[in-house]
């Protein structure tokens, strides 16, 4: 779904990505993790083309729809339900075209509306809004009556309703109560397309994702599994690296000791030279 190849990005006097590469599978639910300030939100901006990479390539299918929840929905006079319904741009366009389309095109329009489940859209939107804490009476209220925190929930509801091919969520539980966060966990787990989630909420990283993308030292590493699984795999990887490092260092010390001892002896010069070549071939640690 999302391919990042040899990405390098410098900004604000530092390097965020250093020849980073990763391939995100279609349909994966990915938790993007890394220490604070490492560049997780910056990666989202690069994918959304809000920032431009210096080198490398970020690619996805041309027809792919991408959505993120960057800010609260504006305080408009449009009702809550209609605001969410408008997020399905194709449905909105098809319904509007019914009044102006020539008769011979109406059959095709109605067929497409049926294909995308247009008649079920209001109930689906209402179900999402209910999960995020809105009451049934709120559906007919204008957006201007909701506070900024509730309009953030509307923006999230609209993104979930539109079901983009790639959904980018940055700390989505920050403006949700416990009930809303639990609902979102379950919703994301069964999201029908690819989603990448930045979160400090360990529960959502364990209960909603099936892959974990780790950003560290300018590199991206994709692990299969949730956050707990990622930690186990990372710890095991570090243990194996430490063991390999210790083995190489011991071998290096042994070879160097032989060279230092016998380099000056003519009878051992050939062997010492051979050990020097072996030293040069040892991998850096």
Located regions from the model:
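ABC ATP-binding cassette signature C-motif
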Residues: 1-246
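Intracellular alpha-helical coupling/juxtamembrane segments of multi-pass membrane proteins
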Residues: 233-258, 262-285
């Amino acid at each position: 779904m999302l391919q990042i190849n040899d990405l390098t990005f410098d900004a604000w006097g530092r390097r965020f990505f250093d020849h980073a590469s990763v391939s995100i599978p279609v349909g994966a639910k990915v938790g993007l993790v890394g220490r604070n300030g490492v560049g997780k939100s910056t990666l989202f901006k690069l994918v959304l083309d809000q920032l431009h990479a210096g080198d490398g390539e970020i690619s996805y299918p041309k027809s792919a729809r991408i959505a993120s929840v960057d800010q609260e929905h504006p305080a408009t006079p449009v009702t809550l339900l209609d605001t969410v319904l408008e997020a399905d741009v194709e449905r909105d366009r098809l319904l509007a075209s019914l009044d102006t389309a020539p008769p011979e095109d109406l059959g095709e329009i109605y067929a497409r509306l049926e294909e995308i489940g247009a008649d079920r859209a209001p109930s689906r939107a209402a179900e999402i809004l209910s999960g995020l804490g809105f009451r049934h009476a709120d559906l007919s209220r204008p957006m201007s009556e909701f506070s900024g925190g509730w309009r953030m929930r509307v923006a999230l509801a609209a993104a979930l309703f539109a079901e983009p091919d790639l959904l980018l969520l940055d700390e989505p539980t920050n403006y949700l109560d416990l009930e809303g966060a639990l609902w979102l966990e379950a919703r994301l787990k069964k999201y029908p397309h690819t989603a990448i989630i930045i979160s400090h909420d360990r529960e959502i990283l364990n209960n909603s994702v099936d892959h974990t993308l780790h950003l560290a030292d300018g590199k991206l590493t994709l692990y299969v599994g949730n956050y707990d699984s990622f930690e186990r795999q990372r710890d095991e990887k570090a243990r194996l690296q430490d063991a390999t490092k210790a083995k190489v260092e011991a071998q290096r010390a042994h070879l160097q000791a032989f060279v230092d001892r016998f380099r000056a002896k003519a009878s051992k010069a050939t062997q010492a030279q051979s050990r020097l070549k072996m030293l040069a071939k040892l991998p850096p640690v």
